A protein has these predicted regions:
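Generic transmembrane alpha-helix signature in multi-pass membrane proteins
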Residues: 9-12, 21-28, 114-119, 126-136
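Transmembrane-helix boundary and interhelical-loop signature of multi-pass inner-membrane proteins
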Residues: 32-33, 53-76, 155-200
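Membrane helix-loop-helix hairpins that form the core translocation module of multi-pass transporters
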Residues: 37-91
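Small-residue-enriched transmembrane helix starts and helix-helix packing motifs
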Residues: 1-14, 90-91, 97-117
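Transmembrane helix exit motif
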Residues: 79-101, 189-199
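Juxtamembrane helix-boundary/capping and inter-helix hinge elements in multi-pass membrane proteins
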Residues: 26-37, 105-108, 134-140, 171-174
Length: 206
């Protein structure tokens, strides 16, 4: 249960489905509610698949390139802290999808895989976190994947009601949510960085 909770709390703030809402609404503006729901569902299923591939195949990727797991955690921590500062800084560019990519996506028949699933919901930060997760037992591995599914379920619900949430929260509410998610992501990034440094240089913690 602890593994499930840790996976959910860590990933949810990094995935940050609230940040995906504006792009989702822009790209599905002309769709009916049923089609919008199908797009959100497909994107969340793709997200679980992407994170699962990163989780199960990550160690093989690290071994192939000769990368130490702690080095990956340091890189992931820096990446998360950078993303967090973008969310916390007023007026900073918070778009995960550039204007050119956004314009191109408007003409695509299916936007669920890209740009929604990747990079909006499962970007480099979330994939780095999944690769860095070490689960020694099959039960822990299963709980981790279940955690991915719970994050996807939460993201699906948020995207499904994104139009109503945007109307209720308004711009001030959305900005507040971005700062809350940014603060949590910053704390997670610092924790990843500090834990990796402590593992590489145990003498520093004495």
């Amino acid at each position: 249960m602890e593994v499930l909770l840790a996976t959910f709390t860590t990933l949810f703030s990094i995935v940050n489905p609230f940040g995906a809402m504006p792009v989702f609404l822009t790209l599905t503006a002309e769709d009916r509610a049923a089609e919008r729901a199908r797009t959100a569902l497909r994107a969340c299923v793709y997200m679980v698949a992407i994170l699962s591939v990163a989780f199960f195949g990550g160690q093989y990727i690290l071994n192939f390139f000769g990368i130490n797991i702690q080095h990956l955690r340091i890189a992931g921590g820096i990446l998360l802290m950078r993303s967090a500062f973008e969310l916390l800084t007023p007026g900073a560019n918070r778009d995960r999808v550039g204007p050119d990519a956004l314009e191109e996506s408007k003409h695509k028949d299916d936007i669920s895989f890209t740009p929604l699933a990747m990079p909006m919901l499962s970007g480099p930060g979330s994939m780095a976190i999944c690769i860095g997760l070490i689960r020694p037992t099959y039960v822990d591995k299963a709980m981790t994947v279940f955690g991915f599914a719970l994050v996807a379920l939460a993201a699906f619900i948020i995207l499904l009601f994104s139009l109503r949430l945007t109307r209720v929260l308004g711009k001030p509410g959305m900005a507040a949510m971005a700062r809350i998610m940014g603060f949590i992501t910053l704390a997670i990034g610092v924790n990843f960085f500090a834990t990796a440094i402590a593992a590489l240089f145990p003498g520093l913690t004495r």
